[in-house]
Amino acid sequence: MDVGSCSVGNNPLAQLHKHTQQNKSLQFNQKNNGRLNESPLQGTNKPGISEAFISNVNAISQENMANMQRFINGEPLIDDKRRMEIGPSSGRLPPFSNVHSLQTSANPTQIKGVNDISHWSQEFQGSNSIQNRNADTGNSEKAWQRGSTTASSRFQYPNTMMNNYAYASMNSLSGSRLQSPAFMNQQQSGRSKEGVNEQEQQPWTDQFEKLEKEVSENLDINDEIEKEENVSEVEQNKPETVEKEEGVYGDQYQSDFQEVWDSIHKDAEEVLPSELVNDDLNLGEDYLKYLGGRVNGNIEYAFQSNNEYFNNPNAYKIGCLLMENGAKLSEAALAFEAAVKEKPDHVDAWLRLGLVQTQNEKELNGISALEECLKLDPKNLEAMKTLAISYINEGYDMSAFTMLDKWAETKYPEIWSRIKQQDDKFQKEKGFTHIDMNAHITKQFLQLANNLSTIDPEIQLCLGLLFYTKDDFDKTIDCFESALRVNPNDELMWNRLGASLANSNRSEEAIQAYHRALQLKPSFVRARYNLAVSSMNIGCFKEAAGYLLSVLSMHEVNTNNKKGDVGSLLNTYNDTVIETLKRVFIAMNRDDLLQEVKPGMDLKRFKGEFSF
């Protein structure tokens, strides 16, 4: 039922007419073999009759229904200004079955009856009293059309009368005042009366005034209307000085906002090297907002306090040897941490530290290290490429787009400059969206690839990343496979291919790609973690647990021939791995193992059951 049809300011005959038709149908059925349960909608197409209301017969008294019947049969009409339209409305709502096409009605005629009631809303919505209250009811018809369960915060009464019949289309309906206490009392009193004597009824006008007064007293509608009218008058009579004051406050707010924004932009320029925020990129202030958001939220690299390589002048060389010999990435990271502690401007140490941490499933530390590298060497291609990937992994897509732009400008300055000159219209526009930025950068990289005589696997990587950010995994897979045809022994690319296959719901193929990456680099922690996730997706939980335990074991390091602060390592950086392991044990119904999973746990507890 439309919310507007409940208003006392509109024609109260509408409610009486609906219920009188219901009672008339029931009386007709009583005369025909007493078939009280037969629906009046069966075999009829009368508008305005709803089977949904049959469950609530005698919603008003028999006395009022008889009077209403006299009116319908040709008794004197009330004034034309309050006349209701008996014919069907042309502005009828679409059938509920069209709104919720995935649900099937158990009784189509019942749903049709519910729909037929909606023709009353067109008359009631034309009333001035309702139009003056459109803040509460103006969107009620739209709410019905989209299957909303709430029409107005002021009219949220449960309509239990409708629920039993419209369940196939809507779970519940709100916005009806038919179940307010006043009407509930009328329903109960109406059931006790059997006969109707038309000659003993009061005049029609007295009945309507009585009904309207009763509803107004119980629901306080008149008070609400008066309050809203008073508020409207106050707003119309508001002095001009108040409006001027509001304008002054608005200007002050704008001034304060601009001051804060300029401060944020200045902070971004101080943190990043000038090459990353200068006007050469010409990407507009809106983009710098996205990039600045990442920069302003940047955290310093979190060093491990217990590090045996501190004060070792050969820490960088030791780290390189550990990586070349396939040692644990966590141990190599400690060596590089010691190297940058010893020499904070060591560009290669920061770069390798960032590469190690991103492969070691410690993304945030990797991002911090790579950003430090770019501060020292803004044109470091490897740092820019890896940082763009990490930004995408962490959801900083806009920052990744700018990093890819800077990477292409650095590696192919002449070609990239020519491409950007041909398409500088976009660069001068402001207010572009994430999708626009993606499409623009992708178009430029495609032009760059077409200008090269041979396939550059790094260009294919960048294109794959751009397609990845808009969930176009098929094109992402094509790009990564093209790169692997040029360099088939790139374990990082095999891992990226596996991630794309996994996101395409091709877990079996993803597992093969991860295995290939681990064959090329057994210490590749991220590939091992991704392998565990894909194993979970196909229900191989025991194998997944083994891979996750391997990841945790590879984060353990020995310091001074003693176990290091493994618990701190796990608790600080490997919460994701621990939580994933918990989910695996839950899926296996192994509460005994679940209780053992915590930071600093002894992995030997799991050796007997899992292979890692």
From Swiss-Prot:
Start and end residues of each stretch annotated as Amphipathic helix 3 (AH3): 158-174
Motif extent (WxxxF/Y motif 1): 120-124
Organism: Saccharomyces cerevisiae (strain ATCC 204508 / S288c)
Effect the entry attributes to changing C6R: Abolished monoubiquitination by PEX2, promoting polyubiquitination by PEX10 and degradation. Loss of UBE2D2-independent ubiquitination
Family from the record: Belongs to the peroxisomal targeting signal receptor family.
Region feature Amphipathic helix 1 (AH1), mapped onto this chain: 7-29
Protein name as catalogued: Peroxisomal targeting signal receptor
Role: Receptor that mediates peroxisomal import of proteins containing a C-terminal PTS1-type tripeptide peroxisomal targeting signal (SKL-type). Binds to cargo proteins containing a PTS1 peroxisomal targeting signal in the cytosol, and translocates them into the peroxisome matrix by passing through the PEX13-PEX14 docking complex along with cargo proteins. PEX5 receptor is then retrotranslocated into the cytosol, leading to release of bound cargo in the peroxisome matrix, and reset for a subsequent peroxisome import cycle.
Region (Amphipathic helix 2 (AH2)): 70-104
Region (Amphipathic helix 4 (AH4)): 257-273
